[in-house]
Amino acid sequence: MLVLGIESTAHTFGVGIAKDQPPYILANERDTFVPKEGGMKPGDLLKHHAEVSGTILRRALEKANISINDINYIAVALGPGIGPALRVGATLARALSLKYNKKLVPVNHGIGHIEIGYLTTEAKDPLILYLSGGNTIITTFYKGRFRIFGETLDIALGNMMDVFVREVNLAPPYIINGKHAIDICSEKGSKLLKLPYVVKGQDMSFSGLLTAALRLVGKEKLEDICYSIREIAFDMLLEATERALALTSKKELMIVGGVAASVSLRKKLEELGKEWDVQIKIVPPEFAGDNGAMIAYAGMLAASKGVFIDVDKSYIRPRWRVDEVDIPWRN
């Protein structure tokens, strides 16, 4: 089985190709929109994705050394994400499905992150941290679905850091040589400032932390503010994670999503693993950020259980939660 996956939920347009036997991932091509200033404007994302979609599709097919006719199914991330960006990927997927008579497989973006994590880390039954620009979720698989044990009550961890560095003119670009701008700034900071620390059970809140940090700009060294906001945010996440580990008694902790690439977070998680006698499984950097390979792979798993969708019902779902998705391949 060969599945072509299309990712376009936010700033990245990606096309991946997966097959149902090793090495599983045959291609993983993408192009990421980087704004010249400010944040991501939906109209700019739509324009970028539309412009690069054809090139990325061709590159993926060339990388896999196959033609579109060799593909069995077309998988597409229908949500969650930014509406105009999602529509580009959905439109391309529908067109390919109709033109080449290929069944369409609906994929939840978060499930894509999680499943590529299972593949690349070889985790068996983990507690999962799904951390990205739009999501901060603590989850695990139980009785047919991924059940959420904790999440952000407002903005996501990645979004909070992106907004801060943008507001203080440290970004864009947000990622420089594999490091987030807040990590680079934090390297010269050492003073831990007093900022809000909000953990409620296994849920977290980052909006107050962001607001308080911005109010300190001009009053404290920027490097110390960056250091403090990062350390406090990560410590909040670790406290919520420890509570979930105590509740679930899991012996594996898997981290997926773009924030999983953070070296400083990895170090904290490794320490947590030693304290709790838990194996830490972190998705490789090349699969941490948004990519088409994760959509192709999750689509392949879904297709193996007959999960398809008619083209005329393939609506985008900008607020599609991971705990709303049935997972028949893990029953």
From Swiss-Prot:
Highest taxon, organism lineage: Archaea
One Gene Ontology term of the molecular function aspect: iron ion binding
Single GO cellular component term: EKC/KEOPS complex
Keywords associated with the record: Acyltransferase, Cytoplasm, Iron, Metal-binding, Transferase, tRNA processing
EC number: 2.3.1.234
Residues annotated to bind substrate: 130-134, 162, 183, 262
Protein's GO biological process: tRNA threonylcarbamoyladenosine modification
Cofactor, free-text remark: Binds 1 Fe(2+) ion per subunit.
Entry-linked Pfam families: TsaD
Cofactor: Fe(2+)
Subcellular locations according to the entry: Cytoplasm
Function: Required for the formation of a threonylcarbamoyl group on adenosine at position 37 (t(6)A37) in tRNAs that read codons beginning with adenine. Is probably involved in the transfer of the threonylcarbamoyl moiety of threonylcarbamoyl-AMP (TC-AMP) to the N6 group of A37.
Family: Belongs to the KAE1 / TsaD family.
Protein name: tRNA N6-adenosine threonylcarbamoyltransferase
Upper taxonomic lineage: Archaea, Thermoproteota, Thermoprotei, Sulfolobales, Sulfolobaceae
